[in-house]
UniProtKB/Swiss-Prot annotation:
Name assigned to this protein: Small ribosomal subunit protein uS15
Biased composition (Basic and acidic residues): 1-11
Highest taxon listed in the record's lineage: Bacteria
InterPro entries: Ribosomal_uS15, Ribosomal_uS15_bac-type, uS15_NS1_RNA-bd_sf
Length: 89
């Protein structure tokens, strides 16, 4: 359900705006999207896992807040993120 350190480093590397960038909203959205994808696959086999489902909803809410922040700051970055991570809006 959690992502491995290697996968997280790979996601950070592909989403970073500059070297050493781990905290920008784009990187945070990328990491959250990866975790959400993993949890979604988990729920295909464990349909009654409501405890983890609550965690998924919290991750989605956090990602939504970050996306709203990016949209408020720069619409082009927002649209690029939606396209890159296949996020519905």
């Amino acid at each position: 359900m959690s992502i491995t350190a290697e996968r997280k480093a790979e996601v950070i590397k592909t989403s970073a705006t500059k070297a050493g960038d781990t905290g920008s909203p784009e990187v945070q959205v990328a990491i959250l999207s990866e975790r959400i994808t993993n949890l979604t696959a988990h729920f295909k086999t464990h349909t009654k896992d409501n405890h983890s489902r609550r965690g998924l909803l919290k991750l989605v809410s956090t990602r939504r807040s970050l996306l709203d922040y990016i949209k408020k700051k720069d619409e082009a970055r927002y649209k690029a993120l939606l396209e890159k991570h296949n996020i519905r809006r």
